[in-house]
């Protein structure tokens, strides 16, 4: 059975740029996105906005054995193994990215009380980037500061690819944020941004993926046990 994984690692700038320009390939690796880290909600002109020493890698594998082999036998895989990663069971997809269009709209049921990992992936329309930043940054801060996220970050690959990754204590908490059921003024932020996106899309392609976390490995920024 295929699985997905999301990895975080620190790397020298030269190695990070090399991985962006030449993403890894391996037997059993169906798709990979190599991105540099961004802090959600950070100012546009800021070293926190594009963190070249922080790599994020999102991948789809034929099975868990293919991932284990890559982490043990490939130089880049061994570097990834020294960071943090979570192994993921795919549950649902909204929207479409060409490389992931084979994923069904729904592959499994979600218990509202179980921990959930959400990944978004977008190919930007470059003229729409200023609008995207204007409407997106408040939502970034909302997700980053939400009491029910244990980790929330963004990543990008110049010039068009943007991704977010968030770990939620429950599916109920995540959908409450998405549909504006949280209390107070922040509740409207995500809903209003979606209305603006529907008015004129920011993206050529966009997908939101929901996963069940299977296992967590390593540590990131001094933290482990990030999955509730």
Where are these regions (language model features)?
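Short S/T/G/P-rich N-terminal loop/turn motif that feeds into the first structured element of a domain
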Residues: 1-55, 62-70, 81-158, 173-184, ...
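Generic transmembrane alpha-helix motif of multi-pass integral membrane proteins
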Residues: 57-59, 164
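Catalytic-core segment of enzymes that process non-peptidic bonds
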Residues: 74
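Alpha-helical membrane segments in multi-pass integral membrane proteins
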Residues: 155-156, 163-166
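Aromatic sugar-binding interfaces of carbohydrate-active proteins
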Residues: 185, 189-196
């Amino acid at each position: 059975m295929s699985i997905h994984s999301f990895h975080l690692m620190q790397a020298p700038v030269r190695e990070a740029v090399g991985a962006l320009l030449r993403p890894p390939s391996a037997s059993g690796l169906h798709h990979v996105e190599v991105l540099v880290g961004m802090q959600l909600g950070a100012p546009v002109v800021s070293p926190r906005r594009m963190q070249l020493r922080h790599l994020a890698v999102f991948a789809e594998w034929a099975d868990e054995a293919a991932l284990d082999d890559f982490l043990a036998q490939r130089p880049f895989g061994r570097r990834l193994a020294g960071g943090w990663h979570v192994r993921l069971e795919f549950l649902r997809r909204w929207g479409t990215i060409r490389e992931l269009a084979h994923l069904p709209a729904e592959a499994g049921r979600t218990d509202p009380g179980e921990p959930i990992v959400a990944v978004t992936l977008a190919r930007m329309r470059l003229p729409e980037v200023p609008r995207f930043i204007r409407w997106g940054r408040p939502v970034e801060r909302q997700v980053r500061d939400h009491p029910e996220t244990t980790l929330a970050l963004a990543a990008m690959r110049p010039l068009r690819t943007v991704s977010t990754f968030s770990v939620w204590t429950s599916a109920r908490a995540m959908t409450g944020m998405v549909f504006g059921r949280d209390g107070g003024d922040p509740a409207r932020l995500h809903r209003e941004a979606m209305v603006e996106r529907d008015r004129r899309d920011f993206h050529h392609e966009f997908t939101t993926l929901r996963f069940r976390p299977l296992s967590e490995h390593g540590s990131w920024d001094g933290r482990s046990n990030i999955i509730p």
